[in-house]
Amino acid sequence: MITGFQLIEEEICQRIQDELDKIGIHYRIFSRSKDEKSILEKIDRKAKEGSPYEKNGKLIQDIIGIRVVTYFRDDVNLVKTILSRIITFKDEEIDNPELTVFKPKRTNIICSFNDSQQQTFAEVQKSSDKDYYNVLDSTFELQLRTVLSEGWHEIDHSLRYKCKNDWEGHYENERLLNGIYASLETNDIALKNLFNELAYKHFKSKNWEGLLRNKFRLRFQLVPLKEQIVNILNEDVEIGKELFKMDRETSLLKLYDIDLSLPVNMNNLVLLLNGLIIKDEKLLAITPDVILEEIK
């Protein structure tokens, strides 16, 4: 373990967690920084593949790897949008799905270190006499995955990407492995649709907590909806309809943009979305001043 790289890794992870926790997205974060053995192995492997790393050419850009694994497919793009506002994206490798080909969809992004991380990286370089530091870039790789596809990507990376020769000429096996990914992708879509359907059923039965929980799919605190809010929603079903029809990603980004630290619970969600989008006077009348000041 190279201490300087580990410090940068921890700093990046904490920054990502701070941003995503603002709106309560369901996710897990994994990270690693390459040690000397891993760096030398990669340099040797790429040289044998005919694509060597060079001081003034191709550099190793993933000495630090960060993977954000979301519970739901639609959160991948949401996370990407949020992180693009706090991290400089240098290069992106994002696959577009093909209709007639079983192929995994990658969302891999090369990101630049910020100024303090650049300084730490430079200090690590200066303090070492190892030649391999000449082919290390001051970047990290950010990977975005869903929880269903995460295991498949781990298998693919360890048993196909790192040993490509094993798969040469075995196209049916390769197609089958990709087909397994395709089934996981289909299940990702089905999972999101399942919760949307459940949210609609809760809307029809005026189960407002069920609607909010399954529509927005956030890490809500276990705080029930206040009776005042429930009564207003029961009396005016159009408010519930607007909540159900609301574009989830757009509304969550609006919440993210607010410079206000509030607990992630259903009461705050309803009052914030009403103040930002719906504008119902009855809900505005019971909205705390601290929220009104921020959203006016």
Where are the regions a protein language model picked out?
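Short Gly/Thr-rich strand-loop-strand
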Residues: 90-132
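Surface-exposed, low-hydrophobicity interaction/linker segments
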Residues: 6-50, 265
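Short amphipathic alpha-helices in soluble, non-transmembrane regions
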Residues: 79-86, 123-127
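Short, flexible, solvent-exposed loop/turn segments with mixed acidic/basic and small polar residues
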Residues: 53-61, 131
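Short helix/loop capping segments that flank catalytic or ligand/cofactor-binding pockets
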Residues: 77-79, 118-120, 150-153
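Short cationic amphipathic helices and targeting signals
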Residues: 62-71, 142
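A common structural junction motif
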Residues: 84-91, 163
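An acidic, glycine-/histidine-flanked metal-binding catalytic module
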Residues: 2-4, 8, 19, 132-296
